[in-house]
Every structure is written in C-alpha cells, then in structure tokens.
C-alpha cells in the first residue's frame, strides 16, 4: 500500500462522500483487485459510519499513512456532521476495530431495500449483514409471496427478513450459531414482523435432516454457506451432501438459490455438482451482483445461482 495507492483511495472515497447513498452500501471494494495496492481493503458507508476494513497487515508505516489519509477525509467539507470513522483490522484474531473519529458503537441500525437490520460494529469479525448479497435479498423478497422458505446457514436471517417482507407464508431458519439466530429475531422485530410464521433452528445441519424435512416441503430453499466453518462445513467436501437432499425437501415446483462466495470456486462448481447430485433441478440464472462490488475476474466474486425443478 504505497503512496500512489493511498492517493487513489483518497480520491475514490472523496468522490463517494460527495454522493453518499441513503442506505448502506460498499463505497470502495479493493478486494475485487481493480486497484493495485488496495486488494486487501474495503470501505462501507453504514448510514453515519464509514467502516474501513483491512484484511492483511500492511506494516506499521503504511498503516500510519492510511490512518492519516482517512483522517484527512474527516476534515473535508464533504464529511457528514457527526459521522464516525472506524478502521477494522480483520487480519487480527479479534478483528480489532479502532475509532478514528467518534466512538465504536455497541450496536448500529442500517437499512437496505427499505428493511432495517441491526449490526455489531467492533465486537466481531462480521458485523451481521453481507452487503454483496443485496440483490440476492431483493430477489428473495420479490419471489416470496405465499412461499414456504427454508433458509440454510441463516446467520442473522437477512434472507428471512426479506422473505417475510415479501409475503412468505413461512420461513424456517437453520444455523448452528444461536447468537446469530437471536440477532435474526431482532431483525424481524425491527421490521414489525409477526414471528408466528418464522422458525429458528439452532442446530448443526448434517445432524438435523429429519427435523428440516418434517417442516417441509419448501417452495424455496436458500443455501448460503461459509466457504469453511471449522468443525462443521467445508465447501468442497460438504456442499454436495446438501444438494443431494434437495429433491426430498422441495415442493413440486420448488426453486433453489444456491450461493458460493469463495474466490477460488467458480459458478461451474455449483452447476456441475447440482447436475450430478440433484439432476431433477435445472440451472436457471445467475443473479447479478451489485455494481459497487466490481471484480477483475467476475467468477471470483459472489455466485448466487437459481435452480428450478424440471
């Protein structure tokens, strides 16, 4: 991260500050490798917080230079009054977040597609909502009317919130992280949703197929796993186990949204494995990613693929 890269960052963020979005958005996506020297840095506008995240230790001198560049932004006429500036060190075991302006809030409320979500800033590696899945949540909201939805690896239930907002008849959320599911309940309550049609299962998926199947069949199944979760999920080893179960979980005209966010795994992985493990399902389309997530290699970015029962 040399002086030229930092100047590029300063220019890009200055432009972003001149036209900040009303909702939360990524405003700089270095991980798409479109800007040399900034491949390990992102910046998100979270409606009153500019969160800059570093995914690799740049070294002491470049880090201090980065701090100085960011702090100059807060003195510019474009800087919003009372906005906070946070720098998250994602490469550290505790993903430490330092406040360069203002304080690190314990909780923070944002909106996306007209829906509200609660974030954790400064306490965890991930803050509670993956912004690159914005179009995926919008698609679910558009498809959900009257549907029975299964949301696997639900995390904080962003897909569930979108589905209920779109008129889903019922949503079953499954994730082994009960604290994340609890935040999912909070997100539903933030949006005034009746939780009578929402189920939260804090179980390990591969030990819970019976319970999942009994709550079906489902009109829409969403699969959005981590690339690797120590002790419970490895994408290359375990995704196939889910795909082969889909025919018994889906309703007659069932639809699947299958996702992968590993830069080393292209969309062909899901298409080929689905054809092998669940040939009853045909590939329909790959959802577009938001434009604020440019990638020099599009197949390295988020893959959200739609499959439909033949």
Per-range role (PLM):
Residues 205-279, 287:
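S-adenosylmethionine
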Residues 270-310:
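Class I S-adenosyl-L-methionine
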Residues 176-222:
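S-adenosyl-L-methionine
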Residues 170-175:
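Conserved SAM-binding motif I beta-strand of class I
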Residues 156-168:
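Conserved SAM-binding loop of SAM-dependent methyltransferases across substrates and taxa
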Residues 1-47:
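Non-catalytic accessory regions of SAM-dependent methyltransferases
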Residues 146-155:
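Conserved class I S-adenosyl-L-methionine
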Residues 36-37, 42-44, 65-130, 138:
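Non-catalytic substrate-recognition/targeting regions of SAM-dependent transferases
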């Amino acid at each position: 991260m040399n002086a030229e890269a930092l100047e590029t960052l300063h220019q890009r963020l200055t432009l972003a500050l001149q036209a900040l979005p009303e909702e939360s958005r990524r405003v700089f996506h270095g991980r798409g490798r479109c800007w040399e020297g900034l491949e390990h840095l992102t910046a998100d506008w979270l409606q009153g917080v500019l969160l800059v995240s570093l995914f690799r230790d740049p070294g002491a001198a470049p880090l201090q230079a980065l701090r100085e560049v960011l702090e100059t932004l807060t003195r510019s006429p474009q800087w919003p009054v009372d906005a906070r500036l946070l720098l998250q060190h994602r490469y550290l075991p505790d993903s430490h977040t330092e406040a360069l302006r203002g304080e690190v809030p314990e909780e923070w409320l944002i909106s996306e597609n007209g829906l509200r979500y609660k974030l954790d800033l400064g306490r965890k590696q991930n803050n509670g909502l993956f912004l690159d899945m914005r179009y995926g949540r919008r698609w679910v909201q558009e498809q959900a009317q009257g549907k029975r939805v299964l949301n696997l690896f639900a995390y904080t239930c962003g897909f569930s919130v979108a589905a209920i907002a779109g008129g889903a008849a019922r949503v079953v959320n499954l994730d082994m992280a009960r604290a994340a599911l609890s935040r999912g309940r909070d997100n539903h309550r933030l949006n005034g949703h009746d939780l009578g049609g929402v189920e939260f299962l804090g179980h390990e998926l591969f030990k819970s197929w019976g319970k999942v199947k009994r709550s079906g069949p489902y009109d829409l199944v969403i699969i959005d796993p981590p690339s690797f979760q120590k002790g419970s999920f490895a994408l290359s080893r375990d995704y196939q186990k889910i795909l082969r179960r889909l025919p018994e979980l889906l309703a007659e005209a069932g639809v699947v949204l299958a996702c992968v966010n590993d830069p080393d795994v292209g969309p062909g992985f899901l298409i080929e494995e689905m054809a092998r493990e669940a040939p009853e399902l045909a590939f329909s389309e790959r959802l577009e990613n938001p434009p604020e997530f440019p990638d020099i290699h599009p197949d390295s970015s988020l893959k959200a693929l739609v499959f439909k029962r033949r």
